[in-house]
């Protein structure tokens, strides 16, 4: 009798837990919206938005056009999550309890927005896309099932594949389709490929981190597809012109390869498929080298290192700016007009090639320290909920994001990087993901 009663109770609970037809439709719409959001975030740059009629990267145009479409959609999805929960307090409390660093980063973005507005500065939307959007991502993807994360991973791989192919086509054709623009004006002297990520150095940073993530076993690609993707991304990396990204990838990637080779030799087991694939790749290597040489790939690679376009001088000159600003102003935040004037004097119109130094010059030491701590806690929180192997791309990201203006300007780079870590290194089921 007790068994029959327990069975009836279990059936009633299952009926309650089973979503109705309306809810099932809404859940499908939510899944499609998440995939669309990932596509917008990773695949839509400011250059593409300009082609679509939105002046995202300039100072003219409507205020609404200065915020990335992925940010709008992320806010809508967060709002839907609150509505779907029935009691909005529950997901808010869950975010505060389980993603405190993400909440902190988003709050810092809002506070930075208020600070810039109070000081009469420009670029208010930069703090929203750079920090608030990044802070929302771990909250938005919290407790997502494997199928959802798998779809987002597929979108990420597809966009990175298209980005690499478009970068190579831009190199071969000499035409840039979606270059980085400021108020519609592209820098004609910059011949680096832009592809789908807009700024070439941001593209190189994301590509380098993606390569290292794949090298550490991130994602679900089969070995042959993984090796092919790594090779393609390595070739495309050169077209984006990131010398630091190229060197960092080769150094860290070589370390990963040597460790893997040592492990394989110690075990004494080399898979037959891997050996056959290596032999096949070696036979194709001369053909690939000839094709790349004919396309001017190696000339481009050498040119990146022989001529830096004044980048090294700019890194020296940006330190000279500090001599003209009193320490008290550096502590609390120098005058925006003074900083912009000094940039023009020292020939730094293209940007200050270090995220932290640029943030100090525009927001002061105290604000920059808070932002650095918030970003560090954020990356540690994301890494904590990922499986092993995530720290290598994080190390590369920290190195590369400080080789250009990076997080000091308006960018979705941190949000893209967080999405990459979450979908390529999802936690194992044993760690409690539902």
Protein language model regions, located:
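Alpha-helical transmembrane segments of multi-pass inner-membrane proteins
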Residues: 153-177, 195-259
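Transmembrane alpha-helices of multi-pass inner-membrane enzymes
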Residues: 78, 212, 391-401, 408-434
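Membrane-interface helix-loop-helix junctions at transmembrane boundaries of multi-pass membrane enzymes
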Residues: 85-101, 217-228, 265-271, 377-394
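Aromatic-anchored transmembrane helix interface
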Residues: 99-110, 119-144
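Hydrophobic transmembrane alpha-helices and their immediate junctions
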Residues: 276, 280, 362-402
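Long extracytoplasmic/lumenal interhelical loops at the membrane interface
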Residues: 56-61, 177, 297-363
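N-terminal signal-anchor transmembrane segment
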Residues: 2-87, 112-114, 398-402
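A membrane-periplasm/extracellular boundary helix in multi-pass inner-membrane enzymes
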Residues: 165, 172, 257-306
